[in-house]
Design a protein with these regions (language model features):
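Conserved ABC ATPase signature
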Residues: 98-107, 277-304, 323-327
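Long, non-membrane, amphipathic alpha-helices that form coiled-coils
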Residues: 4-25, 42, 66-69, 160, ...
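Extended helical coiled-coil dimerization/tether regions that scaffold
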Residues: 32-80, 86-89, 130, 208-291, ...
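Pre-Walker A (Motif I) flank of P-loop NTPase domains
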Residues: 92-96
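C-terminal lobe/lid and adjacent interdomain/linker elements of RecA-like ASCE P-loop ATPase modules
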Residues: 1, 6-7, 11-17, 23-38, ...
Length: 459
């Protein structure tokens, strides 16, 4: 595998070793932090340039020097119709699986992580529309960095809290991402947010915008923006090396998923709405949609995702929402095998019970209780926490540990409903729902002894 250095680190090293002015150092720091600069940030850099001041921002942390681990997500109130005071304890050293039917509310939790982590596709968070006076959004995320003590971040889910450190290191993927990655157009393109090398292109764009701004304010200062030191970055050469390495890894990852070689060539990078996308060409003169099935197009987007993670040697969390839509069972099995090879902390939301059982029953997986301590999780196999996500009436995102949604669990909810004072009609409806589930579970537990038939598949 090629030795690829993250472009954020290249920019940091550039600011250290070169005697550059304060405004350029500030421009590099803000590009690392924001990518394509906001108008406010661009104005602040421009002010430093005009005043010939020093950089204001602190030097960012190098990528790869810190590892983020998510410990717990707590939803207190206010996001969509998610039940209040719900929490998900993540498996820090393995996989966290959350399985629930469509409409159960599991994607609400993904959207929280997508918002905080700054996912490529913005999926808005709304207050609970079932309430006349919706509560403010309250979310907490517990995490560690480099194994340090647990820290907590309280989030109200507004726009200013999108893509903030250290959560911008999370890799996020869902079905909407796949639809964006594989889209039929004139050049057979699909879109992947590449976190490895586009900082250099953002810097070039931000510098051009800064020149335009300075030119509108004081043209006589524009010549001072010609920075010969930038030539040392060799942006085009660095990017060419990255694309070649990515193409090799991409083809290998694709073959692992669909079990056959596709002649796919990564040509170049484009920018649409300030977001980078790869242009992809098939060797044969057909459109992508005529060559690949819907499931295989999904595989292409997943393969690119895995290729870049591998190329960057990224060990930060990966969060996937329904990644196996449209995939047949053989491809799902290969996808499971690939997930189990990754060293990252992985969080998976899915409504596919076949996929969930493949993960939980794989030979090299050990399912642990969420109450188990790290000292108890001694197996050399991949560790996994599993949850069931379900809904009742207008309550979404109810969480129970997988396998614990038994008759006793449902009867305990019935008991709580019957003990509520005052007892209202809504309590009766919820109690009736859970009583029916309790009876169904009792039949499974006492008559069928929890035996379930699954079609055999290779492990």
């Amino acid at each position: 595998m090629a030795n690829i250095v993250h472009s954020k680190n290249i920019l940091i090293e550039f600011t250290r070793t070169t005697n550059i002015p304060g405004w350029l150092k500030e421009l590099c720091y803000r590009t690392i932090d924001e990518g394509y600069l906001s108008k406010k940030s661009l104005k602040e850099v421009c002010d430093i340039f005009i005043s010939d001041g020093e950089a204001v921002m602190q030097e960012p942390q190098e990528i790869g020097t810190e590892q983020l681990i998510l410990s717990k997500l707590i939803h207190t109130a206010g996001v969509n119709a998610l039940v209040e005071n719900s929490e998900i304890v993540f498996c820090p050293e393995g996989i966290t699986l959350l399985c629930g039917s469509n409409g159960s509310g599991k994607s609400g939790y993904f959207r929280i992580l997508n918002h905080i982590g700054g996912g490529f596709i913005e999926e808005p968070l709304y207050p609970n529309i079932n309430e006349q006076n919706p509560k403010a959004m309250e979310v907490s995320l517990e995490y560690t960095v480099n194994g340090s003590g647990i820290q907590s971040y309280d989030c109200s889910c507004d726009e200013q809290e999108r893509e903030i450190e250290p959560f911008s290191r999370i890799t996020l993927f869902d079905s909407l991402y796949a639809n964006e990655y594989i889209r039929e157009c004139s050049h057979n393109t699909y879109h992947l947010r590449a976190n490895g090398y586009f900082d250099l292109y953002y810097l070039r764009q931000n510098l051009r915008r800064l020149r335009n701004r300075v030119g509108n304010i004081c043209k006589d200062k524009v010549p001072a923006l010609k920075v010969h030191e930038l030539a040392k970055l060799n942006m085009d050469v660095i990017y060419e090396e990255y694309v070649k390495a990515l193409a090799i890894e991409f083809k290998e990852e694709l073959k692992k998923l669909i079990n056959r070689s596709l002649h796919v060539e990564i040509l170049s990078v484009n920018f649409e709405k300030n977001r980078p996308s790869f242009t992809v060409r098939l060797d044969k003169p057909y459109h992508v949609n005529e060559i690949l099935s819907e499931g295989e197009r999904k595989c292409v987007s997943l393969a690119l995702l895995f290729a870049e993670i591998k190329l960057r040697e990224d060990v930060n969390p990966i969060v996937l929402d329904d990644p196996v839509n449209s995939l047949d069972n053989e491809i799902i099995q290969r996808f499971v095998n690939r997930l189990l090879e990754l060293p990252n902390q992985i969080i998976v939301f899915t409504h596919n019970y076949w996929f969930a059982n493949m993960l939980m029953e794989a030979k090299n997986v050990n399912v642990y209780s969420i109450n188990s301590g790290i000292a108890q999780r001694t197996s050399s196999k991949k560790h996994l926490f599993a949850y069931k996500v379900y809904s009742h009436r207008n309550e979404k995102g109810l969480i129970v540990e997988y396998g614990q949604e038994n008759s006793s669990f449902h009867l305990s909810i019935v008991k709580r409903c019957l003990e509520r004072m005052p007892f209202v009609n809504a309590d009766a409806l919820i109690a009736a729902d859970h009583l029916r589930h309790a009876i169904e579970n009792l039949i499974d537990e006492k008559i069928f002894l929890n035996l379930t038939y699954f079609r055999s598949y290779p492990l």
